[in-house]
Amino acid sequence: MVIGKGLISSVFSNYIDSEDILIFASGVSDSNETRISEFNRELELVRLSLSKYPTMLFVYFSTYSIDHICLNSRPYTKHKLNIENLIQENSSNYLICRLSNIVGAGGNSSN
């Protein structure tokens, strides 16, 4: 299963019908985001997905910024860490990928 409609989710289109793996690619993608409403939207969708599909491998795309001293105090980075903690507390079957610049130059307005 793939949740999301953007660039990352399109890469995993062959998992759309998977009953074992949930690719969560529907989250805050702009690292300059500060709106609480956007963070809450992702938080609630992660909660819903975890409760609705508890046995599936939950694949989440986080950010390398969590370990970067200059970036880990930003709202986006704190939000991603909060989501990671939520996943770890509510699933025993997950993969969290802390990726850097996934999209590349020109694919996201914050790059």
Language-model regions: role of each:
Residues N14-T55, T63-L71:
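NAD(P)H-binding glycine-rich loop region in Rossmannoid oxidoreductase-like domains
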Residues M56-L57, N93:
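Proline-centered loop/turn at the N-terminus of a beta-strand
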Residues Y60-C70, P75, I102-G106:
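Conserved catalytic-site region of short-chain dehydrogenase/reductase
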Residues S62, L86-G106:
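Conserved beta-loop-beta element that borders a ligand/cofactor-binding pocket
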Residues H79:
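Active-site helix of classical SDR
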Residues I83:
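Short active-site alpha-helical segment characteristic of glycosyltransferases
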Residues G107-N111:
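Substrate-positioning beta->alpha
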